[in-house]
Amino acid sequence: SKGIIPFGDDLNQVKSYILKSNLEISKWLIRPSILWISQTDIWLNIVILIGICSSFLLIAGLIPHIAIMSSWISYLSIAVVSEPFLNFQWDALLLETYFLSFFLVPWKLHHDRNSLANPPALSRWLLWLLAFKLMFESGVVKFTFYGVGGSNAWRDLTALNYHFWTQPIPSWISYYIDKLPTIFDKVALIFT
């Protein structure tokens, strides 16, 4: 609540915006978060603990629907008030996957992962569609994103000139790959 960007300040700004604008919209629609209930560190820790416990329940195969939904609600609640930190492509992908997985798991108290039960076809198709969306959008952005000065690092084959030292989760080998000749970068870009 008193961190770098306190989530309580964000929620209060949303609340005052709704009041000033005379909007007939719920604050829950603008920021769908159970952190509206309380903006204290204790409640934030409870929400995090709910997410952790429900993840363990999901791993154990216990009450999978409740576990997925409570994990999704916990993560969504934290993500919408932590946009500078949880606003990456994989955060949205994780939320979408959680939501679609709710329709994938069987309605049982305990799900044995070794069972041969087929998930519903619609659920499988929705997850395949999500995987296609990820791959398609990842490819489209390479050709439609223009940086400063109208340059496109993917079209110019220069994106890997800085990728290895600016990637979000760098590998120990990134330093060494960055030192390879630039022709390696260009060939790698052609094949991605």
Named regions from a protein language model:
Residues 1-192:
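Alpha-helical membrane-anchoring segments
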